[in-house]
């Protein structure tokens, strides 16, 4: 029966795959019962095969390999010899698999493994046994380490307090080695005396190696909450802050990483670091060149500065903004750039740090990373740029940044588009060069497309409309920009934004843009066809009613609705209608909406700028005889005559022009008396020539302030939390705005006017047909 024994041994050695047996049975069209193959018995499928999970077996490959294994023939003597070898070495094979350390060196054991990809049963069983053995060994070692540390800690504590520095050094080295093992590390952190001794030794030693070992020990302890608490209670934070002045890099690394762990996870650590002067030390370390060290240091600064104004001011006083900007300009390590941008983002909402960052070149340095593959870095840079942008309207060398921002308007990321639009809005405000640059790189088309894509997302549409408003006034490319908005199909969506659900800040911005677009005669008809005029009148009436209602209730403060004063809406809508009224067809529409009584009433406004725009629109309407008669019929003569004495030359000139146009059908004697009155009023300071009055600010002045961001917001300020214009709409930078000015009386005497001797000169003194250089809707003074 030797042959049978041989085959049994070979069968044990080969360990044929169960799938091979299953496949063999299925080749004979039998169902596998599981007895021969060992396969799990399952109900036969409809196909007549066995386990459905094994239907993908390549039986031909299995049978081919099986046949290959027996391609060599053996004699009975050879089989008996092989059987004997396997029988004698079976115990060694098991021992080699499960307890390899017990074998004699050099012992040769025949393997039963024919295929290296398929381990034998013994090898498979050995894996869990090895894991169990290692677990037992680790447990024994852990217990040994813990017992050793527990016995050694009291003695080591005494040695750390020894007067002999050599002894202290040896003890510090030993404690450092113990802290590398988990069991002894826990024993150390549970001994307050030991932790205090480590802190004291680190703080007082002059030996570099002792400082390195003690700092390394605290670093190892700081990976556990229990260790962090022990360090904190032992006064470790002041000692670690002191070590930030060490000239040894390894000590610096241990100190900053330990402090970083404390700041992240230990309550009270932030205040302790601040009190120990940690901020000043950390800022001083920003001139190091190790990027990973700098990344940890800047992250510590961010943790300390976030939500703490005093920390932000300390960083400023220590020269932090310049150092942080230098990092952004110098390095390429993504994590360092990200942590540094986070610090700058926190500092950028501080009114003191903001100009310092801008002056250090922060705008340009942050702009270098707007095309980085790291989205978290790009987003932080954009947030920071947006916070800084209202303080950077006078910065030079912004061409690259502006071009990148225009490109980012096409991003699919809503946050990126929102930030890019807000930054462009601020940087184009009252900055001639920036306006030119944005127009030259396709900014008008990009902004119009952004508004079209944004739909009702006002956090995008409002800054985009503000940017368009800035770009359509007061620079050489303004007329091109006014045309470009129309050519890129922007007029319909702009007029649509005057309607619900737009909120007042967006409406205010849109009114200003329409006013600037109306400076281009080619836009008059399209704006009229889109229904801009009736909507402007509706908004004007509503805002005026709100102001009148408040006044009748005894209110003295200007009313804010969603951060916008209703007086701003009154002034803005009237100013837009003033420019639109330059077109004869628009004048007919405006007059047909019964607006003249309201415009006359606005002449009595205590706000000088509202007086000016009201007189301006009446001046345009009075070109038509019917309108001039209607203006006179509404009793406009008295307030207009009073406004002749206004300190604002623009108001006085418009009032004079309306009075003159109203007098065209009057007797010659009346005209002469009016002429003398106008001359004495308008030239009361000096006999200025009429052809010079176009520079007196007859058109509407500039408006508002930059799109700022709340200092109490760590990331960014909503456009709706106060609006982009913080001053009264239309405030002229060259004049003081007297909110409580005179109120013209309704019964101001008009008789006894002298001869009107300067009629033609008066008409020459009106604003030019294109007052593009005087456009007012350009925020941020």
UniProtKB/Swiss-Prot annotation:
Q: Which residues carry this modification: Phosphoserine?
A: 23, 29, 33, 37, 45, 191, 246, 552, 675
Q: Which UniProt keywords apply?
A: Acetylation, Activator, Cell adhesion, Cell junction, Cell membrane, Cell projection, Chromosomal rearrangement, Cytoplasm, Cytoskeleton, Disease variant, Glycoprotein, Host-virus interaction, Intellectual disability, Membrane, Neurogenesis, Nucleus, Phosphoprotein, Repeat, S-nitrosylation, Synapse, Transcription, Transcription regulation, Ubl conjugation, Wnt signaling pathway
Q: Reported effect of changing residue 710 to C?
A: In EVR7; uncertain significance
Q: What is the effect of changing residue 41 to A?
A: In hepatoblastoma and hepatocellular carcinoma; also in a desmoid tumor; strongly reduces phosphorylation and degradation; abolishes phosphorylation on Ser-33 and Ser-37 and enhances transactivation of target genes
Reported effect, residue 45 to F: In hepatocellular carcinoma
Tell me, what does this protein do in biology? Key downstream component of the canonical Wnt signaling pathway. In the absence of Wnt, forms a complex with AXIN1, AXIN2, APC, CSNK1A1 and GSK3B that promotes phosphorylation on N-terminal Ser and Thr residues and ubiquitination of CTNNB1 via BTRC and its subsequent degradation by the proteasome. In the presence of Wnt ligand, CTNNB1 is not ubiquitinated and accumulates in the nucleus, where it acts as a coactivator for transcription factors of the TCF/LEF family, leading to activate Wnt responsive genes. Also acts as a coactivator for other transcription factors, such as NR5A2.
Name assigned to this protein? Catenin beta-1
């Amino acid at each position: 029966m030797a042959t049978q024994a041989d085959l049994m041994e070979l069968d044990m050695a080969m360990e044929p795959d169960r799938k091979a047996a299953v496949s063999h049975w299925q080749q004979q069209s039998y169902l596998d019962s599981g007895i021969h193959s060992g396969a799990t018995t399952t109900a036969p499928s409809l196909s007549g095969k066995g386990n459905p999970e094994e239907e993908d077996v390549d039986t031909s490959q299995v049978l081919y390999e099986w046949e290959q294994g027996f391609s060599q023939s053996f004699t009975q003597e050879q089989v008996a010899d092989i059987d004997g070898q396997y029988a004698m070495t079976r115990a060694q094979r098991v021992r080699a698999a499960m307890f390899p350390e017990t074998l004699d060196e050099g012992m040769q054991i025949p393997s039963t493994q024919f295929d290296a990809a398929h381990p034998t049963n013994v090898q498979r069983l050995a894996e869990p046994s090895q894991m169990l053995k290692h677990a037992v060994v680790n447990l024994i070692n852990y217990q040994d380490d813990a017992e050793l540390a527990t016995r050694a800690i009291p003695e080591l504590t005494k040695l750390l307090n020894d007067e002999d520095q050599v002894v202290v050094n040896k003890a510090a080295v030993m404690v450092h080695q113990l802290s590398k093992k988990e069991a002894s590390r826990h024993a150390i952190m549970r001994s307050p005396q030991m932790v205090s001794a480590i802190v004291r030794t680190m703080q007082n030693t002059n030996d570099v190696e002792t400082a390195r070992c003690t700092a390394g020990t605290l670093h190892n302890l700081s990976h556990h909450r229990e260790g962090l608490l022990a360090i904190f209670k032992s006064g470790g934070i002041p000692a670690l802050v002191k070590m930030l002045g060490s000239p040894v890099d390894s000590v610096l690394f241990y100190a900053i990483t330990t402090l970083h762990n404390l700041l992240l996870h230990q309550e009270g650590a932030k205040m302790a670091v601040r009190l120990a002067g940690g901020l000043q030390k950390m800022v001083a370390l920003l001139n190091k060149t190790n990027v990973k060290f700098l990344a940890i240091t800047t992250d510590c600064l961010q943790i300390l500065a976030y939500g703490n104004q005093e920390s932000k001011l300390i960083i400023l006083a220590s020269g932090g903004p310049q150092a942080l900007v230098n990092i952004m300009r110098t390095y390429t390590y993504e994590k360092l750039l990200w942590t540094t941008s986070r610090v700058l983002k926190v500092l950028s909402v501080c009114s003191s740090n903001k100009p310092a960052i801008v002056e250090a070149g922060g705008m340009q340095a942050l702009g270098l990373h707007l095309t980085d593959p790291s989205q978290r870095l790009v987003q932080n840079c954009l947030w920071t740029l947006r916070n800084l942008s209202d303080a950077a309207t006078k910065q030079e060398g912004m061409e690259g940044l502006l071009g990148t921002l225009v490109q980012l308007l096409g991003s699919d990321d809503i946050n990126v588009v929102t930030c890019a639009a807000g930054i462009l809005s601020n940087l184009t405000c009252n900055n001639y060069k920036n306006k030119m640059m944005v127009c030259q790189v396709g900014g008008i088309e990009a902004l119009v497309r952004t508004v079209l894509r944004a739909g009702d997302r006002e956090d995008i549409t409002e800054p985009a409309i503000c940017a368009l408003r800035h770009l359509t006034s007061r620079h050489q490319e303004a007329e091109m920009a006014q045309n470009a908005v129309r050519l890129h199909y922007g007029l319909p969506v702009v007029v649509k934004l005057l309607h619900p659900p737009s909120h007042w800040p967006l409406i205010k911005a849109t009114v200003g843009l329409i006013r600037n677009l109306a400076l281009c005669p080619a836009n008059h008809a399209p704006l009229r066809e889109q229904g801009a005029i009736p909507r402007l009148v509706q908004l004007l009436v509503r805002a005026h009613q709100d102001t009148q209602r408040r006044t009748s209730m005894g209110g003295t403060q200007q009313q804010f609705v969603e951060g916008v004063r209703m007086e701003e809406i009154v002034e803005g809508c009237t100013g837009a209608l003033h420019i639109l009224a330059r077109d004869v067809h628009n004048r007919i529409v405006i007059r047909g909406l019964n607006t003249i009584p309201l415009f006359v009433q606005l002449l009595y406004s205590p706000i000088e700028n509202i007086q000016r725009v009201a007189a301006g629109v009446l001046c345009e309407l009075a070109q038509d005889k019917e309108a001039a008669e209607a203006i006179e019929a509404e009793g406009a003569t008295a307030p207009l005559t009073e406004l002749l004495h206004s300190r604002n030359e623009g108001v006085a000139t418009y009032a004079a022009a309306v009075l003159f146009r109203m007098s065209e059908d009057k007797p010659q004697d009346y005209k002469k008396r009016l002429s003398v009155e106008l001359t004495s009023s308008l030239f009361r300071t000096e006999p200025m020539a009429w052809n010079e009055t176009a520079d007196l600010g007859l058109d509407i002045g500039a408006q508002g302030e930059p799109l700022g961001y709340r200092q109490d917001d760590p990331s960014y300020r909503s456009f709706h939390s106060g609006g982009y214009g913080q001053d009264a709409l239309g405030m002229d930078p060259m004049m003081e705005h007297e909110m409580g000015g005179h109120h013209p009386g309704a019964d101001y005497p008009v008789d006894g006017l002298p001869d009107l001797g300067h009629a033609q000169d008066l008409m020459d003194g009106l604003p030019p047909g294109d007052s593009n250089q005087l456009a007012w809707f350009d925020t941020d003074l």
